[in-house]
Amino acid sequence: MTNTAATTEAKMATEPPKIVWNEGKRRFETEDHEAFIEYKMRNNGKVMDLVHTYVPSFKRGLGLASHLCVAAFEHASSHSISIIPSCSYVSDTFLPRNPSWKPLIHSEVFKSSI
């Protein structure tokens, strides 16, 4: 394990990562800009389509993708925005593990998954 990876793991164990909203790049990202979840706004800004989640290999397994999703879902919730989970991590991993966020899923997506 490299020193960078060891430092990252130690920091993650003691405190949650700081996730910031980068509106210009249309993504939520870690403070170091290395991990992120990208989105596209649809329906005149009423729907956030989460299209891609990226975590560098040396930071995988630390829960960063989940923290990024929570930041996006919290943002959507506080702004009355619904979500389309186009990213496979969001739809196949995050939502099954965190079903309390499912009410934010855009109704047309929910209907098509029944």
From Swiss-Prot:
GO MF annotation list: histone acetyltransferase activity
Gene3D superfamilies for this protein: 3.40.630.30
EC number: 2.3.1.-
Annotated binding of CoA, by residue: H52, T53, Y54, V55, G61, L62, G63, L64, A65, S66, S88, Y89, T93, R97
EC class name: transferase
InterPro entries from the UniProt entry: Acyl_CoA_acyltransferase, Gcn5-rel_NAT, GNAT_YJDJ
Domain named N-acetyltransferase: residues: 18-106
Subcellular location: Peroxisome
SUPFAM superfamilies (UniProt xref): Acyl-CoA N-acyltransferases (Nat)
Residue positions where N-acetylthreonine is found in the record: T2
Active site: C87
Keywords: Acetylation, Acyltransferase, Peroxisome, Transferase
Superkingdom of origin: Eukaryota
GO terms under cellular component: peroxisome
Record's function text: Possesses in vitro histone acetyltransferase activity with histones H3 and H4.
Name of the protein this chain belongs to: Acetyltransferase At1g77540
Phylogenetic placement of the source organism: Eukaryota, Viridiplantae, Streptophyta, Embryophyta, Tracheophyta
